[in-house]
Structure formats: C-alpha cells, structure tokens
Amino acid sequence: MYNPPPPSGSQGNNNYYRQPSSTPGVSNPNPQANQFLPPPPSNTQAPRPGFPPSAPPPSAPAGQYSMPPPPQQQQQAGQYGMPPPPSGSGIGTGVSLVKDQQISLSKEDPYLRKLTVGLGWDVNTTPSAPFDLDAVVFMLGANGMVRQPADFIFYNNKQSRDGSIFHHGDNLTGAGDGDDEVVSVNLQAVSPDVTRLVFAVTIHQPELRRQNFGMVPRAFIRIANQETTRNICRYDLTNEGGTNTAMIVGEVYRDPQNPQNWSFIAVGKSFPGGLQFLCQIFGVNAS
C-alpha cells in the first residue's frame, strides 16, 4: 500500500512508502537480484522510451487522502519557457531535512507562488558505462494515481497540460556541482484535483549498464522560491538506494486542512524495477 504523508508537523513515519505485497519480488526482493556485475561493452545502447500510450493500466495500489475536496474552479495555467535557473542557484541554505521529515512550505514562505525544485547527484564512474539518471514527476489525484498519462512529467513530456510544471531537460552525464536537473512548479496553476507532486529519480537502462543506487553515494533535492531564489529546504540522501534502481526523493503535497497551502516531505525511499515500477504503482502505462 502507498499512503499519503501524515499531516504536516507530525513526526516521521517510516512506513510512509510501503511496497505492495501483491507485486512479485517487491515485498521480499531477492538480495542478489541487483548485484553489481562487470560493465557491458561501451557500444551497447538501447533506444530511450517515448511518451507512454494514452490508456492507463488497471488500478494499482494507492493511498487515500481523508480531506475535503479541493475547490472546483480551474486555475489559469502558468506558462514556462525560460532557461533553467543557474546550477546551484539560490539564496541561503534553507532548512536541512532528514528522512521522513516534513515542512510547511507555505508557513516558511507565506508569499510562495512558484517553486524551483533542484535535484543533484554524484556517481561512482565506470569507464565503459556512464551513468544517466533521470528526474521525473508524478502529478497525483486524491486516489494516489495520475489522472491521465500526461500527468507523468519526464524528459519526453516536459510540461504538464495545465502549464504548472516544466521539466528543464535531461542531463545525460550528471557532471558538475549543484543541480543536475531542475523542475519549475507554479503552485497557483496546479489543477485543483491534483493533491500530490511526487519527485523521483531513476537510472536509465540499469540492467544493461549493471548499475544501481548503491553506486550513487550522494544525492539531494532542494526547494526554492523561484521568484526570490531563496532556498526553503534541502534534503541530502546518504546511501539510501542499495541495489535498487528507482528512488522517490520527496513529495510536495497540499495541506489536507487548507488545499491552498503546500508542504514537503523528505521521502528517500528506493525500489527495484526502475522507472517501470514507479509508473505501475502510480497508474502510468509505460510498456
């Protein structure tokens, strides 16, 4: 089962993300399944997947929000078309979070309207198999699932239909300091029936390249006010991934008591199965 975060301000919940027992190999993953093997030849490549088909798969496990329905009026969509903010930009360091810790973004910054979400990582390099990590976003409704395939924001679908989210592109190498990939979010333009924005990082072609998050010793997510560039919070992950190939880093979600306010929870939960597994549990057909 996948449950939404508890109300902002509560203590950490280590069972926030739990692997569904009905998914083979998830509740009791084989510890040998993702062990590192020698890297494949450098000329072994496979095409990147395109945008998933329009028909979502059958219902997958999802959490429920016990909250009043959000306002029904549609916000006017925001527009993005600017280049990403400078790598590592932002004023101050913000609040340093630990796993499962939550923070009310609206209380920390009452005038907050637009977010810069920066994600970064360092990797253990292997000469013949360079890493390619991808940041993705799932826009979830109250049932814990995407409403439509277009609610899956990634390198081949960079902007949400309501214009509220813009992915600034795929960094194929992860080289350099600061943010490796950046996502812009206009909170005022997020559709009223979207309650959660899940930010995750996955490894591209993990089986082919014999790679996993145990080879990514440092990763982070930071949340900043895009208009003032002030950093609100940051979560640094330390050896959270093990032999897994997908990681939910954090989540921005509406306050159950006041849907106009937003909070953030540092999740830091990794899974086997890569991007396809995340798509399965959030209702995106990525086959």
From Swiss-Prot:
Pfam family, one: TerD
CDD domains in the record: TerD_like
Record family assignment: Belongs to the CAPAB/TerDEXZ family.
Keywords: cAMP, cAMP-binding, Nucleotide-binding, Nucleus, Repeat
GO cellular component, one term: spliceosomal snRNP complex
Subcellular location as annotated: Nucleus
Protein name: cAMP-binding protein 2
Record gene name: capB
